[in-house]
Amino acid sequence: MGILEKIAEIEHEISRTQKNKATEYHLGLLKAKLAKYRQQLLEPTGKGGAKGEGFDVMKSGDARVAMVGFPSVGKSTLLSSMTSTHSEAAGYEFTTLTCIPGVISYNGANIQLLDLPGIIEGASQGKGRGRQVISVAKTADLILMMLDAGKSDQQKMLLERELEAVGIRLNKKPPNIYVKQKKVGGVKFTNTVPLTHCNEKLIMTVLHEYKIFNADVIFREDCTVDEFIDVIQGNRVYMTCLYVYNKVDQISIEEIDRLARMPHHVVISCEMNLNMDYLLEKMWEYLALVRVYTKKPGNAPDLGPEDGIILRGGATIEHCCHALHRSIAAQLRYAIVWGTSTKFSPQRVGLHHKLDHEDVIQIVKK
C-alpha cells in the first residue's frame, strides 16, 4: 500500500470515528500517523529532480508577500495593478504557469509580491505544481489568499485544508510546549496550566508513535493533540494571512458587508480598482514593518520619503546598527532616541531598546 493510500485510509478512519472520551487515544494515534505520512509525502528522501522553472525566485526587498489561490481569481490582475510587473491574465484557468515576482513601493519600503500559479485541490499530495507553489509560499512573510467573492466559502475551506496539510498554520502562534529528547530517564511530563483537550496518557501514546521514550515535556498552555504533534514534527510554519475577496462588484451589498466585517478579511475589485489603498494599508499592518530615521550630532534628521531604514516590528537598536553596518553594534556606547518608544524625548538607550515606527536615532560610539 502506497503513502497516498495510507493517508486516505487514515483520513477515512478519522472521519468515521466518533469523538468522545473512549476514542480520544485512538484518534490521537491516528493523527500522529497521518502527520508522519504527510511529512514523508512532502519531503522525499531522494535528491530527485531539478527545481521547477520560475520557482527559484531570489528573495529581495524588505519583505515578501505570496499570493495563493485557485486559478482565475485575479492574482495576476492584482500584481499588474499594484506593481510595474505585467503578469498574463485571461478568462481561462492556469494562465500563470511560473512564479512571477513584482515589487510594491510603500512607506519607503520595497515589498516583493509573488504571483504563484493557481493552487488546485490535492496540491498537498503533489498534484500539479502544488508542492513547488507551497514551498515558495513557506518563504513569505505574509500570505495573501485570493478568493473569488462568489465562491469564497468553498475556496477558502479547500485552500485552508491544503495549507494545513503541508504544515502551514495561518494566523496562529506556535504552541507554548517544550519537548526535549534525552538519552535515558523515561518521559517526564509537566503542565503548568489545567489541560482540557489532552492528558498524560494521550501524550505518551503520541510520543511512542514517534519512537520517543525519553524526553522532558512541558505544557505551558492548554493545547490540543494536533498542536502537540506540530511541536514534535518541528517543521510547521506559522504565518499571518490576509483573505482577499476579489470580484465584489458581482455580489450583493449585504454579502460584501458580511465579508468585510470578518477578521483578517479585505474586499476588493481589481477590475474596478476598488479598495486597493485599504489592502495596501492592511498588508503594511500585517507585515509589522517599522521605519526609523538616523541623525548625526548637530544635524537635523533626514525625514524624506526615500530616507530611513526599514526594520521588522520589535526591532531593537542592535538590529538598527546591523542594518547600518555590522561593526557599529560592537562600537556603540549608547543611542539617543526621539519618538514614541521612549518615556522622554530624547532619551539615552542601550542596544536592547525596542524601536517604534518613525523613531529618530542618533548613534554615539565609544
Swiss-Prot record:
One of its GO terms (molecular function) is GTPase activity. GTP binds at residues 69-76, 115-119, 246-249. Coiled coil: none annotated. Keywords: GTP-binding, Nucleotide-binding. One of its GO terms (cellular component) is cytoplasm. One of its GO terms (biological process) is cytoplasmic translation. This is Uncharacterized GTP-binding protein C02F5.3. PANTHER family: DEVELOPMENTALLY-REGULATED GTP-BINDING PROTEIN 2. InterPro entries: Beta-grasp_dom_sf, DRG, G_OBG, GTP-bd, GTP-binding_2, GTP1-OBG_CS, P-loop_NTPase, Small_GTP-bd. Belongs to the TRAFAC class OBG-HflX-like GTPase superfamily. OBG GTPase family. Residues 63-288 form the OBG-type G domain. It comes from the Eukaryota. It comes from Caenorhabditis elegans. Pfam families: MMR_HSR1, MMR_HSR1_Xtn, TGS. Residues 288-365 form the TGS domain.
